Amino acid sequence: MTPKVTIYTDGACKGNPGPGGWGAILFYGDKKKEICGGEPGTTNNRMELMAAIQALELLNRPCVVELHTDSQYVMKGIQEWIRGWKARGWKTADKSPVKNDDLWKRLDAARARHDVDWRWVKGHAGHPLNERADALANEGLRQANPRVI
């Protein structure tokens, strides 16, 4: 039987660009795992992508995944834009290079191992698991830049 995993992700950035963090909560049966990390110089979109990447890469075998994100950038990118980008050799419709293509390629590879149901959740709307993912992203931001309070 294929394992079922529920994931909540979020990214945070102090300045854009600036120090940033990502966080994710993974649920598998009655088990819960929280992860976070950060980078000293990044963007909010890169941190949103990293949260999903890190969570999916943590899974050591193919799973049925329900992944929740409050990022329209991640949702539209993975569900709509990525097919065109790949078909055009990682160029946008106007022939510009895709921003963050290194992370989009990594996310594409990470999701290929799993059956992922992408779910959008409204950010900062009081959803407890999204709020926890946000807190983890902010913890990752603090780890990347201890001077950020």
From Swiss-Prot:
Mg(2+) 2 binds at D10, D134. Its cofactor is Mg(2+). Endonuclease that specifically degrades the RNA of RNA-DNA hybrids. HAMAP family: RNase_H. GO terms for molecular function: magnesium ion binding; nucleic acid binding; RNA-DNA hybrid ribonuclease activity. GO terms for cellular component: cytoplasm. NCBIfam families: PRK00203.1 (NF001236). One of its GO terms (biological process) is DNA replication, removal of RNA primer. The gene is rnhA. Keywords: Cytoplasm, Endonuclease, Hydrolase, Magnesium, Metal-binding, Nuclease. This is Ribonuclease H. It holds the Pfam family RNase_H. PROSITE patterns: RNASE_H_1. Mg(2+) 1 binds at D10, E48, D70. Belongs to the RNase H family. Its EC number is 3.1.26.4. Monomer. It is found in: Cytoplasm. CDD domains: RNase_HI_prokaryote_like. It catalyses: Endonucleolytic cleavage to 5'-phosphomonoester. Binds 1 Mg(2+) ion per subunit. May bind a second metal ion at a regulatory site, or after substrate binding. InterPro entries: RNase_H, RNaseH-like_sf, RNaseH_domain, RNaseH_sf, RNaseHI. It comes from Caulobacter vibrioides (strain NA1000 / CB15N) (Caulobacter crescentus). Coiled coil: none annotated. Residues 1-142 form the RNase H type-1 domain.
